[in-house]
Amino acid sequence: TLPPSSAASDVYKRQYEDNWIMVDLGISFADESMPGVDILLPDIDFIIERRDKLKGIFLTHGHEDHMGAIQYIWEKLRVPIYGSSFTIALLKKKLKEVGLLSNVKLITMYENNIINIGPFDIQPVSLTHSIPDPFSLCISTKSGTIFHTGDWKFDNNPKLGKKPNYEELK
């Protein structure tokens, strides 16, 4: 069973004027207080009502609590999804399993390549985490900048991937 929840996962909505982006779209796992429920989906009714203003979904990394709801919710949003090479590879596998891979526009982000989408300029910045290829996002508009980290840790000797980009973090 997949009930919606307002506190189920990582999903963030960012607005500038009449334009929206989402950062992450994850699931949460139910506990013993919810027998018969395996996962919880985020409540996205608010953004569904503004779907025509939604420019895209940006993923910080490939953990389920950050991207696990896409296979269940994408049909309601139908926007491009952006992520690192590793995150997109994980998402492709999930989308293929449910027959959505050919329908979803997936765009790979690269560090220091700024993505211009509507009024947003989004710059991925390398971090480290317990999964390869995570990004923080520097989201800029004419009115200012938001720095969205997602999950992270500082690891100067990662087994996979790059060290955090300390220069960009300054």
Task: Name what the model sees in each region.
Residues 13, 22-24, 58-59, 82, ...:
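Structured core elements
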Residues 66-68, 134:
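Short glycine/serine/threonine-rich phosphate/pyrophosphate-binding segments
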